[in-house]
């Protein structure tokens, strides 16, 4: 009986080793492809929020990590991608969190030019209710295009609110919390850039390039 148990344990151990080895080999063979796909997805989003005619540098390499919970909605350092044309600063793409979405945190990226005018907004991830809050996603509606051409005049700019709160941005029928959260997050990101643009250009480019 003891011999049978030892044999069974040996077989299980060998199986575990083989399975682990297979996982490691698969990861080694696919990690470069996965990293490339992630880089291409990031590049696509960056070019959507910072138009190609606004920069000639590789945005995903011109990246600095910034830790500012008040502006970016999280105490985790967030990437800010600095755009330039012929060596001159022309804007940025700022990743930020709207922590007060209806179903949790909403991750966004905001593009601005050097005059702090919004050139694009995209939602990177969310858990909002399908058919209601998910209208922030460009695959559902183009609601985020309402930010294009806008800027923030002051930290307490009251126009940066949904119409229900006296602002300029549409809310969704039956889902005011979601657009309200995104509007506030975009406003904070734009104002942060507007008041820290010079400082951002002096920070180290310390994001990990995949």
From Swiss-Prot:
Q: Can you supply a Gene Ontology BP term from the record?
A: electron transport chain
As one GO molecular function, the record gives: FMN binding
EC primary class: translocase
Q: Where in the cell is it found?
A: Cell inner membrane
The family database entries (SMART domains) matched by this protein are listed as:
FMN_bind
List its EC numbers. Answer: 7.-.-.-
| Cofactor names | FMN
Query: What UniProt keywords are attached to this protein's entry?
Result: Cell inner membrane, Cell membrane, Electron transport, Flavoprotein, FMN, Membrane, Phosphoprotein, Translocase, Transmembrane, Transmembrane helix, Transport
Q: Which Pfam families match?
A: FMN_bind
Which InterPro entries does the annotation name? FMN-bd (IPR007329), Ion_transpt_RnfG/RsxG (IPR010209)
One of the record's GO cellular component terms: plasma membrane
Q: PTM FMN phosphoryl threonine: list the residues.
A: 176
Q: How does it sit in the membrane?
A: Single-pass membrane protein
Quaternary state and partners of this protein? The complex is composed of six subunits: RnfA, RnfB, RnfC, RnfD, RnfE and RnfG.
User: HAMAP family recorded for this chain?
Assistant: RsxG_RnfG (MF_00479)
Q: Give the similarity note.
A: Belongs to the RnfG family.
Q: Which NCBIfam families match?
A: PRK01908.1 (NF002519), rnfG (TIGR01947)
Query: What protein am I looking at?
Result: Ion-translocating oxidoreductase complex subunit G
Q: Which organism is it from?
A: Aliivibrio salmonicida (strain LFI1238)
List the taxonomic lineage.
Bacteria, Pseudomonadati, Pseudomonadota, Gammaproteobacteria, Vibrionales
Q: Which gene encodes it?
A: rnfG
